[in-house]
Amino acid sequence: MARIAGVNIPDNKHAVISLTYIFGIGRHTAKNILAAVGITETTKIRELDDAQLDAIRAEVAKVPTEGDLRREISMNIKRLMDLGCYRGLRHRRSLPVRGQRTKTNARTRKGPRKPIKK
């Protein structure tokens, strides 16, 4: 297994699919990375030599991935909560942020039902 950005990616899959095992890299970004390096999408990781893997690592390093991306996302949410804007309040109260209804749905976000205490 090749190791890119701290993630073991599978050898027996196509390069595009293997790169998507890295948090922050989807199919579109994986295709762009492979095009920049000059590798076809259907090439399997085990068929690549060390120079090509190093080139892929260099391209992946330009994209925020794994821990850096997770930290950036959590800092963005924290910033919204500190501002006190509507989206920040919804995050703070663990309610849907993007305008979904909450009268009957949103059980995943709100958690299990709490019984009414008499």
Curated annotation (Swiss-Prot):
> What are the BP-aspect GO terms?
translation
Keywords assigned: Ribonucleoprotein, Ribosomal protein, RNA-binding, rRNA-binding, tRNA-binding
Q: Where are the stretches annotated Disordered?
A: 92-118
UniProt cross-references to Gene3D superfamilies, sorted A to Z: 1.10.8.50, 30s ribosomal protein s13, domain 2
Which PROSITE patterns does the entry link to?
Answer: RIBOSOMAL_S13_1, RIBOSOMAL_S13_2
Q: What Pfam families does this protein's entry cite?
A: Ribosomal_S13
Name the InterPro entries for this protein. Answer: Rbsml_uS13_C, Ribosomal_uS13, Ribosomal_uS13-like_H2TH, Ribosomal_uS13_bac-type, Ribosomal_uS13_CS
* A GO molecular function held by the record: rRNA binding
TM spans, by residue? none
- Give the CC-aspect GO terms: cytosol; small ribosomal subunit
The record's note on quaternary structure and interaction partners says: Part of the 30S ribosomal subunit. Forms a loose heterodimer with protein S19. Forms two bridges to the 50S subunit in the 70S ribosome.
**What HAMAP family has UniProt attached to this entry?**
Ribosomal_uS13
Q: What does this protein do?
A: Located at the top of the head of the 30S subunit, it contacts several helices of the 16S rRNA. In the 70S ribosome it contacts the 23S rRNA (bridge B1a) and protein L5 of the 50S subunit (bridge B1b), connecting the 2 subunits; these bridges are implicated in subunit movement. Contacts the tRNAs in the A and P-sites.
The family classification in the record reads:
Belongs to the universal ribosomal protein uS13 family.
Its name, as the record gives it, is Small ribosomal subunit protein uS13
